[in-house]
Regions:
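Long, low-complexity, Lys/Arg-enriched
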Residues: 1-424
Length: 424
């Protein structure tokens, strides 16, 4: 339902605004494009769709218009995870190949394989690249070929679709091609998306009018193409060509993702078969049509999450490695302190509602579970004197001497406490 809602919103709005082309960007634009293609059976005058191989990695060279742009890479890279050698891998298209890079860096006390410890170190490194290694002519030739490659897609009145979130890639492309690349997002995370749209002078259209709790990993995974990711563009030939990394998925991962995607597309195909052209008149709110999808992301049971436990999420730019999707998922739930929907329903349902006293008793049982008697005595003395008196009576009620000996210091301590509080 969520996929149908997104694709139907996109196709109706792009027809209304009379775009000629819709360019689906990056791997997570793949499944929305497939849904868009299905809906074109109903919407005959829909803009032409195309798929652009692009990623944050691939766009790094395109973002370096001049040497000053080198310093902006810290906005894209988690610099503490990187060494000069790894950064150079992304910016080699603007470095003078006639010079010995490692030797020049060593002369400036920069070691190729030592991670940056601060943004200051990173900027010092970029200063050396800018002043001693930057090849302006080579960079211009590289940009010219990338620009020609992108221009093949952005003809006529074009717009882009992406899951989200920052609009930085769209800003880079807008500046490179000198166009206003109007963009459609499912959601954004921060106001920086609007800042980038102002810089790029393009309109930003957003499916959700709120920020979902969960963005990234799982949301992107189920929408993404399982083909290898584009990691750059080969400009050695006359015409730029996308360069792909090796496939990161094994059969079990491919089967899981393809099965989920196949089901989503079959659902849309069934809607088309059942409703036909009446789909254009279906009345619904975007929030509610996406609610089952959002509930799954926020409130999936552990057994439902296990479906994706064989998959690892790749994010070299930020985390410098591969992380299990379910681990990321659970971490995000903990980070946002989110309750699952069934927990909220249990809390507010009449039969399962717990009073504050019941909640306190439940918390105490967890705190004191398997604790020694001295620890329990200290806890009750400090925090729960009612339980302390009750337990003493239960254990020593028949021993009057012990009860008397315990009561004297207890009453004395109670009087001192009341005096401190100003009571009589």
């Amino acid at each position: 339902m969520h996929l149908f809602g997104v694709a139907n919103w996109l196709i109706k709005d792009t027809i209304k605004k009379q775009y000629d082309n819709v360019i689906f960007m990056a791997r997570d634009g793949y499944l929305p494009m497939k849904a868009y293609e299905l809906l074109k059976k109903i919407y005959k005058n829909a803009p032409k769709e195309s798929y652009l191989y692009v990623s944050r990695k691939a766009l790094i060279p395109a973002s370096i218009i001049n040497r000053n742009d080198l310093y902006k890479l810290s906005e894209v890279l988690n610099v503490n995870k990187y060494t000069p050698r790894k950064v150079i891998k992304y910016i080699k298209s603007c470095i003078d190949s006639r010079k010995n890079v490692e030797e020049i860096l060593l002369e400036n006390n920069i070691k190729m394989d030592e991670k940056f410890k601060s943004i200051v170190e990173f900027n010092n490194f970029m200063s050396v690249i800018s002043n001693e290694l930057f090849d302006e002519k080579k960079n211009e030739e590289n940009l010219s070929k990338i620009k020609a490659y992108f221009n093949e897609f952005f003809t006529g009145k074009s717009c882009a679709f992406d899951v989200g979130y920052s609009a930085r890639p769209e800003m880079y492309i807008s500046k490179l091609l000198n166009i206003n690349l109007d963009t459609y997002f499912i959601n954004i995370n921060h106001e920086e998306a609007f800042e980038h749209s102002k810089i790029g002078k393009f309109d930003l259209n957003i499916f959700f009018d709120y920020k979902p709790t969960f963005t990234g990993n799982v949301r992107e995974l189920v929408l993404s193409n399982t083909a290898p990711s584009c990691i750059g563009y080969n400009t050695d030939k006359e015409k730029a060509e996308p360069v792909f990394e090796e496939s990161i998925y094994e059969y079990k991962e491919l089967w899981t993702i393809h099965t989920m995607q196949k089901g989503a597309l079959e659902f849309i195909d069934d809607l088309i078969t059942i409703f036909g052209e009446s789909i254009e008149r279906l009345d619904y709110q975007k929030y509610y049509i996406s609610l089952p999808h959002e509930m799954y992301l926020q409130s999936a049971t552990e057994i439902d999450k296990k479906v994706l436990s064989c998959i690892y999420f790749e994010d070299d730019l930020r985390t410098d490695g591969h992380i299990n999707v379910v681990e990321l998922w659970n971490n995000e739930i903990k980070y946002h302190n989110q309750h699952k929907i069934n927990e909220l329903l249990d809390f507010y349902s009449y039969g399962n509602y717990k009073t504050n006293d019941e909640k306190i008793a439940e918390a105490q049982s967890l705190i004191l579970n398997n604790r020694s008697k001295p620890i329990k005595l200290i806890y009750y003395t400090l925090f729960d004197r009612v339980t302390l008196r009750r337990r003493f009576k239960e254990i020593f009620g028949k021993h009057k001497i012990i009860m008397f000996c315990a009561n004297v210091p207890y009453q004395g301590a109670k009087k001192i406490k009341n005096m401190i509080k100003g009571r009589k």
